[in-house]
């Protein structure tokens, strides 16, 4: 039996990176593949991605977006059409040079992102303003040859959705860019229980080839920031490079206004690092593959499994539920489902059946309560909502307690050295100051938040007139 015990994980206070790796492995989300930086998404991990995908897909379709699929391969000549774009991705591109034994006439890039393919397609199908807008989304995997990798957070191949839209006017494309950012923010907060900060990236941090990049940023348990999703307004940068024109309402040729936006399985990494603890994964209920697990106690005794099955039939009307009727001990099962982060555990044994009750245990707080069996259908949905709110509020309190406002350079340096979290400081808008803060303080600009605060008149770095408040931090 000793070999069957669920192994303990490294404590996050001792080694956060190892704690994270232990969770993704021991909660059976992923396994490593034989290709460096690639991961195998196991059934439990993929079910989590599917739940996230389902919600996002419904939200996108409800706002008029259509799913398409583009090829995996991009000809080198096509990738090079937008200069800033290709320079931004060149170091990470994987190339196909041979088909069988034959050398290809032109190298093919395995898509790191699909802007160029969408642009080529749009240039063929758009003639007039009547053809606009086009609101496309793609679910796929992309490849970026990363030097340092970690499951979900930074992998050579990763799953994502990428949206690509074209519009008649600059106002429409800007509205689309911000609407999608808001959709991402509400998904993070309302489904993953992760509080986010919405804002714009600086020129240095924006997407290669974009006119403007908007982001949602979250704070992880180790005080580092995670860019959880981005939405880009391209203006006419790509449409000019790819000659995507339409006849406007006055019979004149115009370039389309374009957007691009995406979120990836990196959100799963965020979910782990925001909510989980030293006992394993803590799953936000709304996306959890299993929301309730029933553990029969003394299941060999008459009536126990039958009662557990009866409870499952009632609960499955209101939640995703499973019974573990394996021959493992109850203690092993408790540890296993704690590690996997299932929000609610129900225990039912002979004594509970006599009293017409079950023992209910919350994963997030470990609180136990006795619930009458007939109340479960009503109690469980309410409790799942309660758990979601509790996780969100706990994460928000943590973020707020680890966000610091500074007005002097030395003060910023001290906070960055001694604390972990977001640092709010004023900035003049100059690249030189942004680079100096990266070099001397060790922080990057996370975003210029939409909700601005006036902390001082001067830039934290050079003392010149400040233009905006910026969130700074160490990041994944």
Swiss-Prot record:
SMART domains: ProRS-C_1. The keyword ATP-binding applies. The keyword Cell inner membrane does not apply. It holds the Pfam family HGTP_anticodon. It is found in: Cytoplasm. One of its GO terms (cellular component) is cytoplasm. GO terms for molecular function: ATP binding; catalytic activity, acting on a protein; proline-tRNA ligase activity; transferase activity. Its main location: cytoplasm. It is an enzyme of class 6 (ligase). One of its GO terms (biological process) is prolyl-tRNA aminoacylation. Keywords: Aminoacyl-tRNA synthetase, ATP-binding, Cytoplasm, Ligase, Nucleotide-binding, Protein biosynthesis. It catalyses: tRNA(Pro) + L-proline + ATP = L-prolyl-tRNA(Pro) + AMP + diphosphate. Its EC number is 6.1.1.15. InterPro entries: aa-tRNA-synt_IIb (IPR002314), aa-tRNA-synth_II (IPR006195), aa-tRNA-synth_II/BPL/LPL (IPR045864), Anticodon-bd (IPR004154), Anticodon-bd_dom_sf (IPR036621), Pro-tRNA-ligase_IIa (IPR002316), Pro-tRNA-ligase_IIa_arc-type (IPR004499), Pro-tRNA_ligase_II_C (IPR016061). Catalyzes the attachment of proline to tRNA(Pro) in a two-step reaction: proline is first activated by ATP to form Pro-AMP and then transferred to the acceptor end of tRNA(Pro). Homodimer. Consists of three domains: the N-terminal catalytic domain, the anticodon-binding domain and the C-terminal extension. Belongs to the class-II aminoacyl-tRNA synthetase family. ProS type 3 subfamily. This is Proline--tRNA ligase 2. It comes from Bacillus cereus (strain ATCC 10987 / NRS 248). The gene is proS2.
